[in-house]
Amino acid sequence: ATMQVSNGEGSQWRIDMSVRGRKGFASILGLNLEQSTVFRVDGDTYVPLSQSTVRKAMFFGKKVTGVYNWQTASAQWDGDLKKERQQAIPLQRGDQSALSLNLSLMRDAQPGRSLSYRYVDVGRVRKYDYKVADATEVVQVGDLSYDALRVYRVNSGDNETILWIANGVPTPVRILQRDKGEDQVDLRLVEYQGA
């Protein structure tokens, strides 16, 4: 997987994430996921402007794009998704896309804090609540070792999301997603390059 943040025109930024299935069933299916969010920074808030998701596999492909229109205070997606998820969604200040949410967690994670965000992405609205561990822990990722804060979603039911965030590292050093106790996605930072 790769994650990249780049400066666009003026005050606009873009965050891209690309995941390639290289092990197990994901490798057999040739599963690939590409996500992108264009956003601007308004004070201490990441403001998403547009979002796209492309999923590819051996037997299917899906593409979804969305626009966050802050002048009309609504967001809307089109592409390969259900009709009810193509309806306009009223926006609220501070709403986050999946990728801008990761940036917000990186910025906001402090020992012992509780964090809350409204996730608006791919035609869905959800409240995401997180708890940050009281202290850092050593996280081994390949040959690298990080002193990182564990940040975990507390209102996700059987679907767990845990991130490990290290001071001075521009992305989470690890993102683990579990469904009913089974690891589904385990992304680990094995290398990063500065600007």
Model-identified regions with their sequence ranges:
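Acidic, serine/threonine-rich low-complexity disordered tracts
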Residues: A1-W70, D108-A195
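Hydrophobic, well-structured mid-protein blocks that either form specific transmembrane helices
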Residues: A57-N102
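Short, polar/charged, low-complexity connector loops/linkers at domain or secondary-structure junctions
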Residues: L99-P111
